[in-house]
Amino acid sequence: MKANRFFMTAIFSIIGVLAAAQPWMMRPQGPANEFSAMEGSSVLNYNLQMERDIHSRAGYGPAFYIFPDSKLDNNQALELAGKLDLVNIIKEYGGRIMVVNPSSDKWQEQDLENFRRLIGMGGSPTNVKVIGIGSGATFVNRHLAATDLTGVIAGIVSIDGEPGKICKLPVPAFIGGKNAAKTAKPYQSTSDAAPADPLQKVVVNTDKKASLETLFAEAWDKVLSENYRYNNLYRTFYMSRGIDNPEGVKNFELVSIPVFEKLGIQRNVVEYPLVDMNAPSRPENPDKYLWYEYIPKQALDAAPGTIPLVVLFHGHGNDPRTQSESSGFIELAAEEGFMVVEMEWQGSNGYQPMGLDGIEAVISVIRQKYPQIDGSRIYAEGLSAGAMTSNMLGVRKSHLFAAVAGHSGGIFSGNGLGYYSYGSEPLMNEAIQKRGHVEVGFCSVVGTHDDTIRYLNKDNWEGNPYLNVWRIYETINGMPVTGDLDFNVDPTFGFALQDRTTIHTGKSEDITIEFGQLYKDEKPMIRLMVINNYGHWNFKPAARLIWDFFRHFSRDTETKELRYQ
């Protein structure tokens, strides 16, 4: 089983999605930073000149679809986008702006089908935001809200519209202006009947005199900025095309976007030159490392040696902000008070790959910069290839980390040639050498429907990357090593675990976590979690379960002995 095969499958799947999309979805079709008509439709598309840099956000940018009170031309669309501050939003987050004009003089059923087709083109939508104004809001309330598209849309804003009768599926919404209280009722009724979710909210402003700008600013602040949606149920979301899926999933998962100001998180962007910048012969453009620091307010002035550090690693080819913004650890840091650092470990866009020694060196720099960090409580977590990095670090840098976790990633079989030297043979050899001398807490998380690094079953368990890494950590921790699997013993794991339970996450009855642990001397050294029906990506509720595992482990900074409490 080779790393390249799995990752190239994912890459070619994404390429296939893009190739199948319409050309206007790929590149601006008019002057930069202006609106232009999309060929063969009444829709106007804002042609964003991409200017996002290392200081912007990871992505999941909103795709704004504006249903105006009356048909707008290009200049009117630009004026409206300016009023609502949409251009600045998509410059920070990425995304797009489209004005969905009616296809004739009045809104009609055909406009609904046009919209369905519009958001169904290209890859799976993740952050559809609908803005209805006046008659456009009436159309949204009476027609769009009555369809299953509400399970795909991440937020609806209705301003000065007439009310509809039903909202088919729960959708976050902001209702303002005329008729707001009455218009909100179908949205509220559907929301109230849904399982409790802080992201599933309906906010109402009944001030008839409030300006459009004021109402939308409130909508962005209280509803739209806080979430996005994807469908990672039964498949990996970025390998899907459009809004349709053979499994018939209607209600896409709502996921939080960390809003740093509200969380009390300070984010620092660090470019670190790999030469002495005071040397007279330094190069003009030296090689650099890149990382991101996330510091909760309670950690800013904390006493020396009191703040844990969680180091995150993104997946193969991902943006170096992806893991921090999509894993759930930033939200947890705000609650629990630990610091988070995400590293551009892989190297991209002119930044150097770190390697395992570089990662250790960066942590040393960060500890010198922030004396409040507790060197005995340093942890690592990653996604996919970042999970492999984290899994490697727990063995190769066992003196540094108290515990590590991998989400959607194990260790591939073989000698590691061809993929960052991540092979099970050399890592197992090191684990064997350290067995009886070194202990490391280890947590593994994977979805049963991971179609990039497939989870194990009765047909593929031999040499499976997840079983490889579980055995490696059993070995280094001096525990019995799992042999052949028997899915009659446990239909999920294939062997017996303690504390075995099924956790209901509140997200969906289809998304539950199979949970179990392996003990040594009454200490749970290995925590395994398998997410039923989930694809190859982060599942935010798992972050708390990982942190609850991490927090019990520390490593003596002098003797390097692992401690559990």
Report each predicted region and the residues it spans.
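Bacterial N-terminal signal peptides
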Residues: 9-17
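Loop/turn elements at helix/coil->beta-strand transitions in domains of secreted/extracellular proteins
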Residues: 59-64, 93-98, 124-129, 149-155, ...
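Short substrate-entry loop that stabilizes the transition state in hydrolases
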Residues: 56-61, 66-106, 299-353, 413-414, ...
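Alpha/beta-hydrolase active-site loop
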Residues: 103-123, 130, 142, 350-372, ...
